[in-house]
A protein has these predicted regions:
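C-terminus-biased signal that marks the final domain/tail of proteins
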Residues: 1-2, 10, 16, 106, ...
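A contiguous strand-loop segment
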Residues: 1-81, 109, 114, 307
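Structural recognition of the beta-strand scaffold that forms the well-ordered cores
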Residues: 2-4, 64-67, 127-129, 137, ...
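Short, surface-exposed beta-strand-loop junctions and turns on beta-sheet-rich folds
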Residues: 9-11, 71-73, 143-145, 263-267
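Short acidic-glycine loop/turn motifs at beta-strand connectors
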Residues: 59-61, 130-133, 139-144, 149-152, ...
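A short, structured loop/turn motif at beta-sheet edges
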Residues: 59-61, 94-102, 206-211, 252-254
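Proteins synthesized as precursors that undergo proteolytic processing into mature forms
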Residues: 79, 83-115, 120, 212-219
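Catalytic cofactor-binding cores of redox enzymes
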Residues: 109-145
Length: 307
């Protein structure tokens, strides 16, 4: 089971991998009423130059999460549930859930608490997947959590608008059965990227091998890359696009991470089975921005102070 995402952002996110073994005591970093827990599973996350703010990751059970920007997000009003900060929320799910269903149950019991990071209160929605092929999307609209799971298609996600509206837009295009509809759009805006990704995912050939499957999925996700210097058209005038800083692809079945970093140009992978997730093992890190990273890099991780 494979899943891939692009990280499109207007500023360098200092992409850094962190390896967390199981058995670590953690805090939700959400102020009064923060959750406390001990990690049940090991994980690898992509942090923004810090182990306390991650946007992507996978655990040893094959559960993955991804945070993507969603303009218009309105988080829930703080209530009595134990809180977990936005930067820690993905780690919290990976630490405690083996699959999508368990992660969704946790999200009902523990509240995501927004926080400012590098001067910005980030509006995000979350995609999660597991090794069985189950997936879900979680959005925060009108101060309520909305979950797309089961009957709702959750195999593609970009940015705004919300997923329900994105799915409605698909009916405007010939690729999705509208004989009088539009051809595939070529812009870099989120709707155009959502339509293209949905279309190409439908037409990918059945792979004859795992390497073929990985190559096919990379070929599809690269069609949604935003080039550096791109602009987003709008009635009010073009605005600068957010270039693709990196692409991650997770093999949820075999616990492997494939990573393509744009600047500096790095293309490498991580075999999680070569990492030590045992209780008492050190937390490790590896910057994805070290020039010249190639091949399998699990041996390049170094210890880092945590808490």
């Amino acid at each position: 089971m494979l899943v891939a995402r692009n990280m499109d952002l207007a500023t360098d996110d200092l992409a850094t991998f962190y390896v967390f073994p199981k058995g670590i005591r953690k805090n939700g970093c959400a102020g009064t009423g923060s959750a406390n827990w001990t990690s049940k599973y090991g994980s690898v996350v992509v942090g923004a130059g810090t182990p306390y703010y991650s946007s992507d990751g996978i655990n040893t059970k094959g559960l993955a999460f991804h945070c993507l920007y969603l303009y218009g997000t309105e988080y829930e009003t703080r209530d009595q549930r134990p809180g977990v900060s936005l930067g820690q929320y993905g780690e919290f799910l990976l630490d405690n859930a083996a699959n999508v269903s368990e992660a969704l149950n946790l999200m009902e019991q523990f509240q995501l608490v927004p926080e400012s990071f590098v001067g910005t209160l980030w509006p995000i929605h979350i995609a999660i997947e597991d090794a069985s092929g189950d997936s879900a999307v979680i959005e925060f609209v009108n101060s309520q959590m909305t979950v797309y799971h089961g009957a709702a298609p959750t195999t593609v996600l970009t940015n705004e608008p919300t997923l329900d509206i994105q799915l409605q837009y698909l009916t405007y295009y010939t690729y999705f059965g509208n004989a009088n509809g539009y051809p595939l759009p070529g812009d870099v805006d989120p709707v155009s990227r959502f339509v293209r990704a949905s279309a190409f995912l439908l037409t990918l050939p059945k792979p004859s091998s795992l390497p073929d499957a990985i190559s096919y999925l990379f070929s599809a996700i690269r069609c949604e890359v935003e080039p550096f210097g791109s602009v987003v058209p709008s009635p009010a005038g073009a605005s600068p696009g957010w270039p693709t800083l990196w692409t991650s692809l997770y093999d949820l079945t075999n616990k492997r991470i494939y990573f393509d970093h744009t600047v500096p140009r790095n293309d490498f992978w991580i075999n999680m089975k070569k990492l030590n997730f045992s209780k008492g093992a050190r937390v490790l890190y590896l910057s994805a921005e070290i020039p010249g990273l190639k091949g399998e890099v699990s041996g390049l991780f170094k210890p880092v102070s945590y808490r």
